[in-house]
Amino acid sequence: STLMRSSAASDVYKRQEIRRFLLTLGSHRHVSALARLFNGSKKESLKHDDIMPVVMACLNMGKQKVGALIVIEHNVPLDEVVRTGELIDAAINQRLIENIFFKNSPLHDGAMVISKKRIKAAGCILPVSHDLNIPKELGLRHRAAMGISQQSDAHAIIVSEETGAISVAYRGQFYLRLNAEELESLLTKEN
């Protein structure tokens, strides 16, 4: 029994190490292809009806200068990130998103993860990018968004607490100061 538990734990650890190794290889397209190979077929992409509550919540939070960090998982699983936060598993809902990021909410400082058309978790901790080319005026939310975009194929949406500007980190690139149409277009673009 102890030997079986040890073997199972070793197997889980090896899978995590292999996944980490694959995430560090090559371009994001190669990572996505390898992730699909290990995790099955490509995940269903989010459509207009799925994205609009996120877009509207970001617009409202931007107007009120409420900071937010929302990560939308695609093909590379973010299970390790989800485990760092509080599990929610709720339908994507504008009001829920806004309430989670409300300044006095216990989950407002971390990232929200959306996966399989559901809000999976909030208050999650993301890897921070140490890229020296990130402009100094961009804060920790932007560095965390860039970090997850460099390690996965996820979209990471940032709402700046200081300016209210909405930006996205995707495939290691920033898309800054987006309006509603630009945000929706970027989020519904195929991987």
Regions found by a protein language model. Give the residues of each.
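Single conserved hydrophobic/aromatic residue that forms the stacking wall/gate
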Residues: 1-9, 13
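Divalent-cation
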Residues: 17, 21-191
